[in-house]
Amino acid sequence: MEKLPTFEYLEEKAKESRFLNDPHVRRLVELSEDRSLFEKSPEYLAQLRRDLLRSSLDFFARNSEFYQKLFESQGIDPSAAEPEDLAKLAVPSDLLRGNGIERFLLPNRDPGGFTFRSSGTSGKDPVRIYRSPLELVAMTKANANLFEYVYGDYLKPGQGLALFLAAEELKNHLNFVAFVDLALQYKKIKLIYGMDLAHDASGGPLWKKLVPNKQKILEFVRSRDEPKLFFSAPAGVHLLSEQFGSLGLVKRIIYKLATGAPPINLGRGGTIVTGGGSKGFQVPEYDVIVREARKVFRAEDPSTGKEVPVPFMDVLGMTETLTALLDKYGVMQKIPHPLQEVFLLDPKTYKPMDDYNKDGLLAIFDPLAVSWLEVFIPGDIVRQIPSERYYGREFIYVRRLTEEEGWNLQRACGGTLEELMYRGGALQ
């Protein structure tokens, strides 16, 4: 299996990009690490995204006859394009299965990158998306900045400790794991993987089950580093909460003496970060997971040191997108990176819709992608609500489209991790 390159390697390879002399790409590189974007007004950012849309379409038309003809056939003039034009260009994710991405890739794209694959749990060919080193560096910096905004504080390089309740091999396969791994490398924060992958000796799928590595989990629990960041599918949070919460008095005392837990103290700035939300496989609703976890996990305000309910963040990311949407439980709904154009389509007509508090089909345009024009429909229903934050809107996740609605379901990263934990017996 192809291995995810290190962030250090990607940074060096990105310097060799053939597109660095292109004004559009140079601007993207600068914007990907611009933290001040989160302080801009919704109007300013909407104008910026429109400018990037136009320069992006121009970039692809200059570098690909395929895109030049596509824009002409759709009656789109790159120099006059509007966000409403994106609905004409949005690609359903099902078209990206197998080698579907090939027709959309620039023929002169940068080499030396990495191909991400979706989970493949639907029984169909997984979605495969190629990312150049330049794109992966931009992705890492942009996602780290978005994370810090939603987290509410700056993560000081080299400070803190993270636990990911997943096997390290999955960073070579699932986007959520790769997002986290690269971002923590960028911030120089140590990451511990708390599970092992049990391979299926008979062949077939890459894995059969995930099993907890108790020593690595205890290393995280015992550590006094701050902040402590706990990354997991919702099922993993449920697993630890249930196991520590169900201890009898004697076992609770023994565990407390040996490990200092329960409660599991995440310290100043400690946070739980889940991926993909609760998929409803065999775990409770997300509200229940949060409530039960807060009985077992403890955290402190990063400024005052006073105990606070453990903060929860959730990541909505897809194989097809460079930057994710993040939320913070009880504080904000899902919010995109300032550069990402998130728009809704009517589920029946696929026409753009601007209504608030109405179910719409999620569609995304990410201008940071320069190997293919990243405008796609992942197959999720969301609602948008007005917001006073930089984006002017926030998004509430509702559900996946069903097969009856003409969509082949593909479990997201969080749901895949959840399923693997059950296969391994970890959640029995």
Residue ranges and their predicted role:
Residues 1-43, 51, 55-58, 183-428:
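Active-site glycine/GP-rich loop and adjacent strand/helix microenvironment
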Residues 5, 47, 58-117, 125-132, ...:
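Active-site diphosphate/adenylate-binding microenvironment
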Residues 17, 22-23, 63-65, 173-175:
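Serine-centered coil/turn micro-motif
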Residues 52, 110, 139:
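Short, glycine/acidic-rich beta->alpha junctions
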Residues 59, 66, 70, 142, ...:
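Amphipathic alpha-helical segments that form well-ordered structural scaffolds
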Residues 63, 67, 172, 236-237, ...:
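Short phosphate-engaging motifs
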Residues 112-124, 180-187:
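Short, compositionally biased "basic patch" segments
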Residues 119-175:
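Conserved adenylate-forming
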